[in-house]
């Protein structure tokens, strides 16, 4: 008779690829329209002025400008806004 039971293969050794979530452009940084500001699961950050939201809750710039992170409202929601870049006056 066998002294030990046959060794099975390990059931570990698997992991999913990281999704690279998080803030991609920080407060004070200049962004172009279409730039991704935050990749997230759910609305950890909410879109504010000049910021759009994708179907996967990604926040992106709708206009060129500077990123600003705010805490707004009674619910103290973390909100991202873009302060639009001032267009140079035509001479």
Curated annotation (Swiss-Prot):
Pfam families: Ribosomal_L27 (PF01016). GO terms for cellular component: cytosolic large ribosomal subunit. One of its GO terms (molecular function) is structural constituent of ribosome. Residues 1-21 are annotated as: Disordered. PROSITE patterns: RIBOSOMAL_L27. Gene3D superfamilies: 2.40.50.100. Disulfide bonds: none annotated. One of its GO terms (biological process) is translation. Keywords: Ribonucleoprotein, Ribosomal protein. The keyword Ubl conjugation does not apply. InterPro entries: Ribosomal_bL27, Ribosomal_bL27_CS. HAMAP family: Ribosomal_bL27. NCBIfam families: L27 (TIGR00062). PANTHER family: LARGE RIBOSOMAL SUBUNIT PROTEIN BL27M, RIBOSOMAL PROTEIN L27. Belongs to the bacterial ribosomal protein bL27 family. This is Large ribosomal subunit protein bL27.
């Amino acid at each position: 008779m066998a002294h030990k039971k046959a060794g099975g293969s390990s059931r570990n050794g698997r992991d999913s690829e990281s999704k690279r979530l998080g803030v991609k452009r920080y407060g004070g940084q200049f962004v172009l329209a279409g730039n991704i500001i935050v990749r997230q699961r759910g609305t950890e950050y909410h879109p504010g002025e000049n910021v759009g939201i994708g179907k996967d809750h990604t926040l992106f710039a709708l206009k060129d400008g500077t990123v600003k992170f705010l805490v707004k409202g009674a619910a103290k929601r973390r909100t991202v806004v873009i302060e639009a870049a001032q267009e140079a006056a035509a001479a």
